[in-house]
Amino acid sequence: MFKSLSLKVIIFGFIFTFFSSFGQSFFLGLFNSNIRDALSISHGQFGSIYASATLLSSFILIWLGKKIDEIYIFKFASLVTILLSFSCFFFSKISSVAFLFFAIFLMRFSGQGMMSHTATTTVSRYFTKSRGKALSTIWFGLSSAEFILPVFTIYSVSYTHLTLPTILLV
């Protein structure tokens, strides 16, 4: 189906769409009630913060997304990966409404925005003949994450005392 280099590009796209999940609504929504309880905010307040941060990230994506055409893809992908890692760490340290806004902005921008943008742009550049087939293949990464991450996350949060020993056993 795909040649060696083509397969590497597909795997790259699959991985990036998989990890774009950290900025997707289905994943961030898993923490909604815990965040609202910790910060004593309502559903409406959380929704307003979420929507505002998402809009800001989409506007900035328009400006920064075009940088993928100016920067070597390996360097660009590395920067996006580092930004997502920082975003996840920052998201885990939310302590105020202002931090919540910034954390959601970072997660939406780096995860949903830049990770998926990097995946689709890279794959679209590489494939000319089978572009549709290649893009549909990489988006299986997001579908896989929609199945795997919520289960793994709920398990990890619910059984925190068992998570480390389980990982060490595997």
Describe the predicted segments one by one:
Residues V9-S33, I41:
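Extracytoplasmic
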Residues S40, K93-S95, T128:
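Helix-breaking motifs and short loop linkers at transmembrane-helix boundaries and internal kinks
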Residues T54-I62, F147:
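Residue-level signature of mid-helix packing/kink "hotspots" within the transmembrane helices
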Residues F59-L84, C88-F91:
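Conserved MFS/SLC helix-loop-helix module at the cytosolic interface between two early adjacent transmembrane helices
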Residues F99-G113:
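Hydrophobic core of transmembrane alpha-helices in multi-pass small-molecule transporters
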Residues M114-F127:
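Intracellular juxtamembrane helix-capping segments at the cytosolic ends
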Residues G132-L149:
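Glycine-rich segments within core transmembrane alpha-helices of 12-TM secondary carriers
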Residues T160-T166:
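Conserved small/polar residues in nucleotide/adenosyl-binding loops
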